[in-house]
Amino acid sequence: MIDPDGYRPNVGIVLMRQDGQVFWARRVRRDGWQFPQGGMNTDETPVEAMYRELQEETGLLPEHVEVLGATPGWLRYKLPARAIRRNERQVCIGQKQVWFLLRLTGDESHVKLDHTDSPEFDHWRWVDFWYPVEHVVMFKRGVYARALRHLAPLARGVAGQGVTAMPKSAAEAWMPGHTAGHDRPRKRPRTRGYWPKKATGDGPAS
């Protein structure tokens, strides 16, 4: 489902612990880390899509989380030119997203990255609230900064001083010319996850 402007409706998920740290996951067979996200089906509301993506990508169910809030309207980002498939009947140039802030209320042992036959992630860890803005792939940094800036007051209502004001380094991380790189896997990751048995090739970006 792509709108007339070329953007695919999508939901993003910021899953937070009580202390303000957020869920950060590595994509299968790629060196990029990101928040859970995924496209909406034509018959879904944003909330329905969020719960579906949450279960597909993390194994968590509605009873394991509390919805603290969401961004109003759509937040957009464009895909880099190399990722745009110009030969498609409907050309997707980017994503328009509603971002949800969830608090983990269940035990983190409920996280199952291999809940589906085609997992999105293979490892995950907890990171500081603003960390993702500086470490996600460059073309997503702007939308991450806008989403987290909006959700931060809601997060502070739970975590208090565990969620600080956006640091200068994060505010500048998505500006042109910034040199910070995105996360890359360690040879022995200090993370939770599993190792896929066999590579099947990279699919389209979600």
From Swiss-Prot:
Keyword Hydrolase: yes
Keywords (A to Z) from UniProt: Hydrolase
Enzyme Commission designation: 3.6.1.-
Recorded GO MF terms: pyrophosphatase activity
Keyword field contains Hydrolase: yes
Gene3D superfamilies: Nucleoside Triphosphate Pyrophosphohydrolase (3.90.79.10)
Residue ranges occupied by any Nudix hydrolase domain in the UniProt entry: 6-149
Region feature (Disordered): 175-206
Stored InterPro entries: NUDIX_hydrolase-like_dom_sf, NUDIX_hydrolase_CS, NUDIX_hydrolase_dom, RppH
Cofactor(s) annotated in UniProt: a divalent metal cation
Listed Pfam families: NUDIX (PF00293)
Motif interval(s): Nudix box: 38-59
Coiled-coil region(s): none
Its job: Accelerates the degradation of transcripts by removing pyrophosphate from the 5'-end of triphosphorylated RNA, leading to a more labile monophosphorylated state that can stimulate subsequent ribonuclease cleavage.
Family that this chain belongs to: Belongs to the Nudix hydrolase family. RppH subfamily.
Record protein name field: RNA pyrophosphohydrolase
